[in-house]
Amino acid sequence: MRIVDVCGFYAPQGGGVKTYVERKLKAARPGHEEVIILAPGARDGTVREEAGGAIVTLATPRFPLDRRYRYFDNEAALHGLLDRLAPDVVEVSSPWASPAMVARWPGAAFRSLVMHADPLSAYAYRWFGGVASREVIDRGFDWFWRHLRRLDRQFDMVVSASESLSARLRAGGLGKVATIPMGVEPGIFSPERRDPALRARLLARCGLAPSATLLIGIGRLASEKRWPMVIEAVTAAGYSQPVGLVLFGNGRDRARVVRAADNNPHVHLGAPILDRAELATVLASADALVHGCEAETFCMVAAEAKASGLPLIVPDDGGAGDQFAAGQGCRYEARNPAALAAAIVAFVAGSPAAHRARAVTAAAGVPDMDAHFARLFATYAALGGRWSDAA
C-alpha cells in the first residue's frame, strides 16, 4: 500500500509535525506500506530516503507570515507529481488550500484528511473569545465550517488525534471523523532519565535553590502558545512559593516573551532543544510541565512529558487538556492567567512529589507513535479495500 502524505506543515526546522512524519517513515513496513511525504520545498527532488519510503519536495514559495514554511501554490504540478507517484492512499494534513487541490485530483486513491491543525482554536477563538461565545464565533466563521463540510464530502475519511476535536468536528456537521490518537517516539522518553543534578542547575539559572519547584515550558514562541500569560501566572504564584520556570523555544513572538520575562529573575529563557535524548532528560528532571495553549489537536509535548513521568499543568481545552489525568498535575480554565496562577499554587501546595509518583507509575501506559501508525495503516487497508471494491 503506497501512502502519499501531502504535508503542507512539514519543514526541516519544524516541531511536532516533523517528528510525526519522520517517525511515520520508520513505522512503515517494507513490503506492506510505503510512505512518501510530499512536502513544499525550495526545489523539486528527494531529500531523504528510508526503508519505508521517502521525503519528496515540490518547489514552492515561502509562507510570508513564517518563512520557515512553504506552501503549495501550483495545482497542476501537484497533480502531476501525484500521477507519477500513483498512491493507493493520499493524505492531506492541512485544512487550507491543499486538500481542495487533492480533492480535484482525478486519481482513484483513497483520500484521508488528517487534522494536524485546528485553525478555529488557533486563531478565531483566540482572537474573539474575549468578546463572543464559541457559538457566535462559529456562526461568524460559517464559511470555514462550510469548507470543512465540503472536504468531508470529498474525502473518504477525516482523522482527528483527540476526542475533543472529533466531537467538535462532528457537531459542525462532519460525518466521516475517526479518532486515532497520536503517541510519542518509542524508546526515548522515560522517568528513568531523571537527573537531580540537572534539575538543580536549571533551578540555579532561575536563581533558586533545589528546594524550589521547577516548571518547564517547551514550544514555539508564537502568540497562540500564550507564553506571556504563563510567565504572568508563574510570577503571581511565585509571591507565595519559590517557583522557577525554564522556557525552551524560539519563534516570531520572542521579543514579546522576553519583555514578559524581564521583571522576573526566576524565569529563564533557553534555546530550543533539538536533541531528542536531551529533551527527554530535561522533561524527566523537572517537577511539572506548564502549558498555555489550548489550540493544539494533540499536544505532543504533553504526551512526551507524561511518558517522562512529569505532571501536567494544562488548560481545560484542546489537545493538552485531553492529555490530563487526575492526580498528575492540575488543569485550569483556558485563557485565564489567574486560574493558571491558582493551579500552580495548588500544585505546589499539594505535594509535587506525590503528583510525580503517580505520573511515574502511569508513564509506561502512554501510547507510542508506532502503535498509532499501525492503527492508521490498518484502517486505511480496511476502509481503502472496501472503498476500492465498491468502486
What are these regions (language model features)?
Residues 269, 326-337, 345-352:
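Conserved acidic donor-binding segment of nucleotide-sugar-dependent glycosyltransferases
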Residues 41, 164, 183:
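Carbohydrate-associated surface elements
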Residues 203-204, 209-225, 231-234:
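Conserved donor-binding/catalytic core segment of Leloir-type glycosyltransferases
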Residues 294:
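Aromatic "clamp/platform" in nucleotide-sugar-dependent glycosyltransferases that forms part
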